[in-house]
Regions:
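Short, glycine/proline-biased beta-turn/loop segments that scaffold the active-site neighborhood
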Residues: 273-289, 427-428
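Short, surface-exposed beta-strand/loop micro-motifs that present aromatic residues
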Residues: 551, 558-571
């Protein structure tokens, strides 16, 4: 283990930045197209290209003299082209030279995985480029750390060991410092191999006991991701292994990552005030009791709104059945399995606000024979607007509060919520696998399924949001709908830890982030949109009992969570699909992997202090 750490340290320390005119490095503008080109290898997949993919969405091309013209054509429109050079030779120099002349010297970032003297053969194109990085050897660790330097995940303090005519003098090198998450080993951040064994043990136990078919676990500390592991499969067929790219339905984690991101940005831009009234932003509620809610009240869940909509009642045609709609037991009269119960066998979905086939009005598929559209969303929101309030405004967690928050955000920004958070938050972080409606972007096989719904959906839900309110809203709603992986969520969490700064860019103002991540309700344990440890009643807390008062995060019904600990400079993320194939899953609670790994993390911190 420590020998491996020493080798990693050696490779990381050696990386040398020879040129950085205009402070191109670390690469910024992750919301623009970035391409990676390999020269001197026929493969477009190696440790360098795969590490680049961890930072953002990149197009990768293996370039040769034979395909040079076609490759150059494909690179048009790229804001930056990162070139990994793995061998010497006139052919590769020619390719690099043509690439620089075609794409532009300020847009090409050459990274050399060759011996120092071999760089001399590239003196021409190097002289034209604004940047140049030397990693010295074609080794897995050199490739990993070179990519981290390009994107600001690792410091670069290396110096040229020799002089190379036309390129550099001995001792040349420019210091570059980390500005994004890096990737390292647990020993680098005060954790240990015992913790890794505990993670493996709990995650594998969860898979073996049927608590979930698979999961992702991520731990970051001191700006380094040191655990980023995947376990099991997406479902019981075991056709698709979980990997770092697998997308999970975040369920209510969407509230604190998707909706809250939009609200924070709107607050930052002066479009919303947390002490403003909801009726100011949603005019149809002005003059009503709900219109008097402060945005702060909605974030704290102190509005008197009921916990959720009964979507089964609201979206079922009342004329289609007699007797009770739902039964706890299966029978001939109640044969449709849905929502952990059974639905009346004669019940039918409302045909006035849905369609069994795709139409112009109902164009978003949420089930085998179920399409929804704008009219469906408007119906859901109208029900929320008119739903009776409880007789007090004491804390009660409510999905409906966040539906109202997303609606307010869209009203003031005049932009659909998903586009607003993509453009202003996620894409700037390089979090391209954080999406609503994931089937618009990714293959079904890349998405973990959730529950079998025998009534509304008539299938195992996969690629459509599990939550019924969000599903009938068209897959984009304030309470749920976001899909992501652990690696992407870590970028968002680190941005919060950095008080809005990530990759050298201020994504959100430090004042706004500080307000949201430090505020706590005087009436409950909740934060402004975040969950927090319940210190008064630890047995009711969503965190392990070791989590301190500065911790903030959220959990999701599908088995997801993230927790950020500013005091220990630490991020913990656990994603799984524990509701597959049914939410009636006692094993998830019995195994307790989600909270158990968090507890093991705090024990490791204490053990190594």
């Amino acid at each position: 283990m420590f020998l491996s750490l020493d080798i990693r340290d050696y490779n990381a320390a050696a990386i040398t930045v020879l040129k950085n005119q205009g402070n191109v490095l670390p690469v910024k503008g992750l919301d623009k197209r970035i391409s990676v080109v390999t020269l001197g290898t026929t493969s477009s997949k190696n440790a360098f290209t795969e590490t680049c993919r961890l930072y953002t969405d990149v197009d990768v091309y293996a370039m040769t003299e034979a395909n040079m013209t076609s490759t150059l054509g494909k690179l048009k429109g790229s804001s930056k082209v990162i070139v990994g050079i793995y061998d010497k030779g006139a052919a590769y120099e020619n390719c690099l030279n043509k690439l620089v002349l075609t794409v532009g010297s300020e847009n090409v970032i050459p990274v050399f995985f060759v011996k120092p003297y071999d760089i001399g053969g590239f003196s021409g194109p190097i002289s034209l480029c604004n940047t140049a990085i030397v990693a010295y050897e074609n080794h897995e660790y050199a490739q990993e750390y070179a990519a981290q330097v390009v994107f600001g995940g690792s410091d670069a303090t290396g110096r040229m060991p020799v002089s190379v005519e036309g390129v550099s003098f001995c001792g040349d090198g420019i210091d570059l410092y980390a500005s994004r998450l890096g990737y390292g080993m647990v020993e680098e951040v005060g954790l240990d191999s015992e913790f890794l064994q505990q993670v493996d043990s709990l995650a594998n136990l969860g898979v073996q006991k049927g608590a979930f078919p698979g999961c992702q676990v991520l731990v970051a500390r001191h700006n380094k991701i040191v655990v980023n592991k995947s376990y099991g499969y997406t479902d019981k067929t075991k056709a698709n292994k979980i990997d770092g790219n697998t997308l999970y339905d975040l369920a209510s984690v969407s509230k604190a990552t998707g909706t809250l991101s939009g609200i924070m940005k709107a607050v930052d831009d002066g479009l919303i005030s947390i002490d403003g009234k909801l009726g100011t932003y949603t005019k149809s509620l002005a003059g009503t009791e709900k219109g008097k809610f402060l945005i702060r009240d909605l974030l704290y869940h102190e509005t008197g709104m009921p916990a959720a909509l009964n979507v089964y009642e609201e979206m079922t045609d009342t004329a289609s059945y007699t007797g009770a709609l739902v039964s706890a037991k299966k029978s001939a009269a109640y044969k449709y399995s849905a929502g952990g119960a059974y639905i009346n066998s004669t019940a039918k979905v409302r045909s006035d606000v849905t369609s069994p086939v795709k139409t112009k009005e109902f164009d978003y598929r949420i089930g085998k024979r179920l399409y929804v559209g704008r009219e469906t969303y408007d119906t859901i929101m109208n029900i929320i607007h008119n739903i009776p309030l409880r007789d007090n405004r004491r804390y009660l967690y409510s999905c409906l509060n966040f539906c109202l928050l997303m609606e307010a955000e869209e009203n003031v920004t005049k932009v659909r919520h998903d586009k607003y958070v993509y453009d202003n938050i996620f894409h700037r972080l390089g979090a391209y696998r954080t999406v609503y409606r994931p089937l618009d972007f990714y293959k079904k096989s890349e998405i973990a399924p959730t529950e079998y719904d025998g009534y509304f959906r008539e299938e195992v839900v996969q690629g459509s949001v599990h939550d019924e309110t969000a599903a009938f809203s068209g897959g984009i709603q304030g309470n749920a709908g976001l899909f992501s992986n652990a690696n992407d969520l870590a970028k968002l969490c680190q941005m919060w830890l950095n008080r809005g700064m990530y990759g050298g860019e201020q994504i959100l103002s430090s004042d706004v982030v500080n307000t949201f991540v430090t505020s706590k309700s005087p009436n409950s344990h909740r934060g402004l949109g975040y969950d927090k440890p319940n210190l008064a009643k630890p047995e009711w807390s969503s965190t392990c009992e070791e989590a301190g008062p500065t911790v903030f995060g959220h959990t999701g019904f599908t088995g997801t969570c993230f927790w950020v600990d500013p005091e220990n400079d630490m991020i913990y993320i656990f994603l799984c699909n524990r509701v597959y194939p049914s939410r009636n899953n006692k094993a998830f609670t019995e195994v307790g992997a989600r909270a158990g790994i968090m507890k093991a993390l705090y024990q490791a911190v204490e053990r190594n202090n």
